[in-house]
Amino acid sequence: MQSHQLTHLRSLLLFKTLQTALSRQSGVFLGMECHAFTVADLTAINTEVVTNCDANHKPISSILYAADLSATSDLTTLTNLNTLTAKKVSAVIGQDGAGLGYYLWKGTTKSITSLGATLGAVSFAAVSDSIEWVGKFNFSNGTELDTPAFANGDLVSAKAQSYLDALDSARYIFLRKFVGNSGTYVNNSYTAIISTSDYSFIENNRTIDKAIRGVYSSVLPALGSPLVLNADGTLTDTTIAYFTSLAEVNLTQMVRDVELSAFQVLISPTQDVLSTGELTIAVELLPIGVARSIVVNIGFVTALS
């Protein structure tokens, strides 16, 4: 069997296993298989997740992908991920530059990547957390990942800011340092989709998937239940209140846990449930914001206002 066929088989088996385990976030690492990084993998993984997991009420919110970049000398030549529609997948291109990860890289000449640490951060984070949160997600223990590199072996410190900006704009996840801070952090929590999408960050996908799971589990017991109508054929206030309360219960807990800012459940009383047998419930979510940049204007004045 050809190596690419083996990889495809492993991927299919992986996702069948993930479906069974109901994993919420996972990683796909192909670096040690000498499998070169390709954006086609991102699309294929996303299709598998959306088709076989999300569509069957088993949503996987985040798949981190890393593959071999040892032969890619200039990472800015990688495809801009804004051109993809793989909202459930993120591309990790970071790597350790001086610790154990570095020695594994030197010994194998294949990308080791920082996928494991990134997956750990996503798993530790609340669904609304961005893993770029400096105060919460230090990726280094003082030794490993203390010297950030890229998965082709290049040190982050050796690259111009314009190079880093290009990779950031292309929506890749990599390691970085801050002046005056000893930790190592990631640049952002991007997914492989255009930046204007509602699902362009890992935390957005995790938040809405948790809301979907919560509403599904709380409303499911009412499937097949009676829908009481007024004399004019509209839904009664009691019926609307009942289904609204079902949809709200887990969303209310998410607000308490600071995973949502607010939400609204809307049920039209005029929908024709007698003809369709279908009750439509609209749920609007107001997410938690993320301080992706902080601008401080500071200067001298002649007097304080």
Where would I find each of the regions flagged by the language model?
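Intrinsically disordered, low-complexity boundary segments flanking structured domains
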Residues: 15-19, 158-164, 170-173, 249-255
